[in-house]
UniProtKB/Swiss-Prot annotation:
<keyword id="KW-0999">Mitochondrion inner membrane</keyword>
<dbReference type="GO" id="GO:0006120">
    <property type="term" value="P:mitochondrial electron transport, NADH to ubiquinone"/>
</dbReference>
<protein>
    <recommendedName>
        <fullName>NADH-ubiquinone oxidoreductase chain 2</fullName>
        <ecNumber>7.1.1.2</ecNumber>
    </recommendedName>
</protein>
<keyword id="KW-0520">NAD</keyword>
<feature type="transmembrane region" description="Helical">
    <location>
        <begin position="149"/>
        <end position="169"/>
    </location>
</feature>
<feature type="transmembrane region" description="Helical">
    <location>
        <begin position="1"/>
        <end position="21"/>
    </location>
</feature>
<dbReference type="GO" id="GO:0005743">
    <property type="term" value="C:mitochondrial inner membrane"/>
</dbReference>
<feature type="transmembrane region" description="Helical">
    <location>
        <begin position="237"/>
        <end position="257"/>
    </location>
</feature>
<feature type="transmembrane region" description="Helical">
    <location>
        <begin position="178"/>
        <end position="198"/>
    </location>
</feature>
<comment type="subunit">
    <text>Core subunit of respiratory chain NADH dehydrogenase (Complex I) which is composed of 45 different subunits. Interacts with TMEM242.</text>
</comment>
<feature type="transmembrane region" description="Helical">
    <location>
        <begin position="200"/>
        <end position="220"/>
    </location>
</feature>
<dbReference type="InterPro" id="IPR010933">
    <property type="entry name" value="NADH_DH_su2_C"/>
</dbReference>
<feature type="transmembrane region" description="Helical">
    <location>
        <begin position="96"/>
        <end position="116"/>
    </location>
</feature>
<dbReference type="InterPro" id="IPR001750">
    <property type="entry name" value="ND/Mrp_TM"/>
</dbReference>
<dbReference type="Pfam" id="PF06444">
    <property type="entry name" value="NADH_dehy_S2_C"/>
</dbReference>
<keyword id="KW-0812">Transmembrane</keyword>
<feature type="transmembrane region" description="Helical">
    <location>
        <begin position="25"/>
        <end position="45"/>
    </location>
</feature>
Length: 347
């Protein structure tokens, strides 16, 4: 892609998200969503093949539907309250439709079907943007309207998302689909605590973005897109493979890695609000995600027959300048659990 075009598209994506996050007028928020959606479609189609075109089309149709639902909710709320701005008074029907629209944009169940399909059809770099940056705008609006959200609807969708995120990844061999299902599960954890403690949702989002960015940078570095390529990579660059699998375990929430921190704090927060059944079910469902990450790690490291370096490899490992941030990201993604007592004190 031409550098000028790429820079323009990237600036528009960033601008659209910033407009959504800083606006209090619903029309401006809708414009920001549309700018963001239209700008990212060329990023999804960088490879110019039928699969990426199909992925971009699915993304466009889903996001356009969500935007229409969002405007429908805004119009219903306008007829009842006469307000174009985000206020604490929100019509119940409009609140339900707004929640559905925003969760569709996020990829929560039962509106999650587009996430794995789109992620599988696009390059790793575009998939990174889709699963990290594109979550900021919808989550920021959910954060703003959290006092008016229908709690039962949001908690139900959160629990189903955690379950689907675990079940969906069980039989996957494609790493992009595994990351997509991981994203669905993490979004479920974030939205579960949103109505109780929105700040904790933002902390979870920060940890998720850090871990996912690290994971994708390692996959981009090694050009790995399948579990088989990870197994082959073990023979060529074992250090990078070890780090990749460690980040996977952190994404699954295995103590004492960083990924356990937000899950621990969310379960504690929900329990503090006399909600016992939900965090229990969430913890059980989280074991599904942890299981397929551990199975992948086991299959890659302990069941591969030892081979020599004469094996025909698809790539040659070449360090790149833009990977300078990888070391601090890896440390942050795996070793920040000791900061938990400080965070609990601040809370």
């Amino acid at each position: 892609m031409n550098p000028l075009i790429f820079s323009t598209i990237l600036a528009t994506i960033i601008m659209g998200t910033v407009i959504v996050m800083t606006s209090s007028h619903w029309l401006t928020i809708w414009i920001g969503f549309e700018m963001n959606m239209l700008a990212i479609i060329p990023m999804l189609m960088k490879q110019h093949n039928p699969r990426s075109t199909e992925a971009a089309t699915k993304y466009f149709l889903t996001q356009a539907t969500a935007s229409m639902l969002l405007m429908l909710a805004v119009i219903i709320n306008l007829t009842h309250t006469g307000q174009w701005t985000i206020t604490k008074s929100f019509n119940p029907l409009a609140s339900i439709i707004m929640t559905i629209a925003l969760t569709m944009k996020l990829g929560l169940s039962p509106f999650h079907f587009w996430v794995p399909e789109v992620a599988q059809g696009i390059p790793l770099s575009s998939c990174l943007i889709l699963l990290t940056w594109q979550k900021l705008a919808p989550l920021s609006i959910l954060y703003m309207i959290s006092p008016t959200i229908n709690l039962n609807l949001l908690l139900s969708m959160s629990l189903i998302s955690i379950a689907i995120g675990g079940w969906g990844g069980l039989n996957q061999t494609q790493l992009r689909k595994i990351m997509a299902y991981s994203s669905i599960a993490h979004m479920g954890w974030m939205t579960a605590v949103l109505a109780y403690n929105p700040t904790m949702t933002m902390l979870n989002l920060l940890v998720y973005i850090t871990m996912t960015t690290t994971m994708f940078m390692l996959l981009i570095k090694s050009a790995s897109t399948t579990t088989l390529s990870l197994a082959i990579m073990w023979n060529k660059i074992p250090l990078v493979t070890t780090l990749t699998l460690t980040i996977m375990l952190s994404l699954g929430g295995l103590p004492p890695l960083t990924g356990f921190l937000p899950k621990w704090m969310i379960i504690q927060e929900l329990t503090k609000n006399n909600n016992i059944i939900l965090p229990t079910l969430m913890a059980i469902m989280a074991l599904l995600s942890l299981y397929f990450y551990m199975r992948l790690t086991y299959a890659t490291t302990l069941t591969m027959f030892p081979t020599t370096n004469d094996l025909k490899i698809k790539w040659q490992f070449e360090p790149k300048k833009h990977m300078n941030l990888l070391s601090p990201l890896i440390v942050t993604s795996t070793l920040t659990l000791p900061l938990a007592p400080t965070m609990l004190l601040l809370d």
